[in-house]
A protein has these predicted regions:
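Divalent metal-coordination and catalytic microenvironments
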Residues: 12, 28, 33, 57, ...
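Metal-associated gating/positioning segment near the N- to mid-region
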Residues: 58-129, 147-154, 216
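Histidine-rich, glycine-flanked metal-binding segment
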Residues: 14, 19-61
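Active-site beta-loop-alpha junctions enriched in small/polar residues
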Residues: 70, 140-144, 198
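Alpha-helix-loop-beta-strand connector modules within alpha/beta enzyme cores
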Residues: 125, 129-146, 208-228
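Active-site mouth loops of central-metabolism enzymes
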Residues: 81-94, 157-180
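Boundary of Sec targeting at the N-terminus
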Residues: 4-5
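Histidine/acidic residue-rich metal-binding segments in metalloenzymes
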Residues: 177-228
Length: 228
């Protein structure tokens, strides 16, 4: 029988977010990637199968959570717009793995990815399976918007270059469309539903304050999501 993977971390200081205080000279014991206990003092490993990580000069804190990220579009810089025309889904996926690792190394262990092409769902799955390094992801997959609204993926394009998007693409204009869009996201493995209920930087609206959904359509989205 293989013994469980155990790690000891010698922490100079640990920030306790519950009390708002720092605790000095602690040993964090990790068993099978789960923190099993935090002990006083610096405890030496019992055998050479236990990995020791020396962070006596460092300050440790619980993992941070970012509630609004877009892992697919964080890379690219000035070329981000032209990349929408040139990058395949594979290109987007490879670039998003780099962003995921940078996010984790920055201290964010959980993020909520609210809107993308659907690659964000595959990225979440790859991280959960240990294929790539990254934070725990809760994702909406593609957002849900109205025609011309904030989140319509065809905004800004000539009409002859793109087809009229529908519920699977995240564009709805009726109660029936709304229910179908939510069901597509459930089918594709989304953790949550994102709707862009008002205008924004990606919409054709003159301002971001006016509603873009009817109340009936929003109720249909919420009630359908609640079914799952």
């Amino acid at each position: 029988v293989t013994s469980p993977q155990v790690k000891y971390i010698h922490a100079g200081k640990i920030y306790d977010s519950n009390s708002g205080k720092y605790h000095s000279n602690k040993t964090i014991i990790i068993s099978e990637n789960i923190i099993s206990s935090i002990e006083d003092g610096f405890i030496d490993p019992k055998n050479d199968k236990i990995e020791l990580i020396d962070l006596k000069t460092k300050v440790l804190l619980p993992g941070l959570i970012d509630f609004h990220v877009h892992m697919e579009s964080e890379s690219g810089g000035k070329e981000r717009y032209i990349n929408r025309f040139q990058d395949s889904k594979a290109d987007v996926a490879f670039k998003s793995t780099v962003v995921a690792k940078k996010t984790l190394l920055a201290g964010f262990t959980t993020v909520r990815d609210v809107g993308g092409s659907g690659v964000n769902i595959a990225l979440r799955n790859a991280i959960n399976k240990g294929v790539v390094d990254g934070p725990r992801i809760f994702t909406s997959g593609k957002t849900i918007a109205t025609t011309g609204g904030h989140g319509d993926p065809t905004n800004g394009y000539r009409a002859d270059l793109v087809e009229d998007p529908g519920p699977e693409d995240g564009v709805v204009n009726s109660i029936s469309d709304a229910r179908k869009a939510v069901r597509y996201r459930y089918k594709n493995g989304a953790d949550l539903i994102k709707i862009t209920a008002t205008g924004g930087v990606m919409s054709m609206a003159k301002n971001g304050q006016n509603p873009q959904f009817t109340e009936e359509v929003m109720k249909a989205i919420v009630s359908t999501a609640d079914d799952y």
